Structures are given as structure tokens and as C-alpha cells.
């Protein structure tokens, strides 16, 4: 059975919040290895968003965080 929209949105909003935090970190880090770590976290969160959307029984609109790229 799929997730309800409310269940999916709770998870998606948490992932989007983490993406926003790591974008700030990405932009402030001076070293590439730190940027790579932040980018890895962002990509993982974006994957979680895709999974949550696919498990939901209704369509969920995309947000800029879902596809952010540096």
C-alpha cells in the first residue's frame, strides 16, 4: 500500500530542509572535498525524495530542491 500525501510530504519536507542546509554548506566550504561531501548528501536526499514520491498514491509537485545542481 502506498503512502498518503501527508505521510510522503512529511518526509519530503525533511529532505528538502536538509538539501537547503547542505546547499548553504556547499556554498560556504572553501575546499573541494568538503563540497563533494555536501553534494553527496544533497544527492542522497534527492534520491529519497524520488523514492517517497514514487511510493505516494497521489502526485506531488516538484520543488527546486528536488533537482538542484551546483
What is each model feature region?
Residues 1-17, 34:
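Short, charge/polar-rich alpha-helical segments
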Residues 9, 32-50, 69:
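Short, charged, amphipathic alpha-helical segments
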Residues 1, 23-24:
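Mixed-charge, polar/low-complexity N-terminal
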Residues 19-20, 26, 42-65:
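Amphipathic alpha-helical coiled-coil segments
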Residues 1, 69-70:
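Short intrinsically disordered terminal tails
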Amino acid at each position: 500500500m502506498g503512502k498518503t500525501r501527508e505521510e510522503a510530504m512529511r518526509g519530503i519536507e525533511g529532505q528538502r530542509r536538509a538539501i537547503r542546509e547542505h546547499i548553504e554548506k556547499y556554498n560556504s566550504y572553501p575546499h573541494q572535498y568538503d563540497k563533494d561531501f555536501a553534494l553527496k548528501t544533497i544527492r542522497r536526499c534527492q534520491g529519497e525524495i524520488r523514492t517517497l514520491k514514487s511510493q505516494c498514491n497521489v502526485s506531488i509537485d516538484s520543488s527546486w530542491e528536488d533537482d538542484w545542481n551546483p
